[in-house]
Amino acid sequence: MKTIRTLTHVLLISSTFSLTAQPAMRGPLPDEQQEIIAEMAKRHQDLKRAVELNDKGYTATTTTTDKALAAKLKAHLKYMAARLDSKAMVRRWDPAFVELVEYYDQLDTKITELDDGVKVGVIGKNADAVKVAQNHARIVTGFTKEGAKAVEREHKPALTKDAAENGSKKEAEPAKPEAKK
């Protein structure tokens, strides 16, 4: 009986630690992530981004010569991938990101950490998912070009909502900024 009680305590303690070690995936971004985003937006000119669009999606490489900034970029990408994998919302006020979350299960994403940044390959499982992925690539490129200005505004989804409701999705002009409401 004592062995079972001890084993139960060990399991409870270990599961408690494993649960608390996971970042919160629901609700607002943790302060650490908000600080990373603010830092990357402020130092956007220190980030270099190259994107290759293809008929199945895209490949993007984002790098920096600053090791601390590269570490923040990697931490942010790792967190966002986990958040999207958990089906948690991202930027619920931004139509393009709402669309990304809706289509995320139709995207295959491969993340490769580099010494100076990250390389991300995204493949859409269908034509609409490809459009959504490429729109996201353009938006993130805008973040690296414009910094906070681009981060703070809404972005158009790749697929128009009215076309989606009618069952035939019509491509919208991707990644053009909208004024924040």
Task: Please report, for each region that a protein language model flagged, where it lies by residue.
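Positively charged n-region of N-terminal signal peptides that target proteins for export
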Residues: 1-5
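Bacterial N-terminal signal peptides
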Residues: 8-18
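A low-complexity, Ser/Thr/Gly/Pro-enriched, surface-exposed linker/loop concept
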Residues: 23-44, 68-106, 140-158, 168
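Terminal, regulation- and interaction-focused segments at domain boundaries
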Residues: 52-67, 116-121, 178
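Primarily extracytoplasmic ectodomains and periplasmic/lumenal surface modules that are beta-strand-rich
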Residues: 57-58, 66-71, 79-81, 126-129
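Short, solvent-exposed interaction modules
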Residues: 95-125
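Short, well-ordered, aromatic-rich surface patches in folded extracellular/luminal domains
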Residues: 113-150
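Compositionally biased, proline/threonine/alanine/serine-rich low-complexity intrinsically disordered stretches
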Residues: 159-181
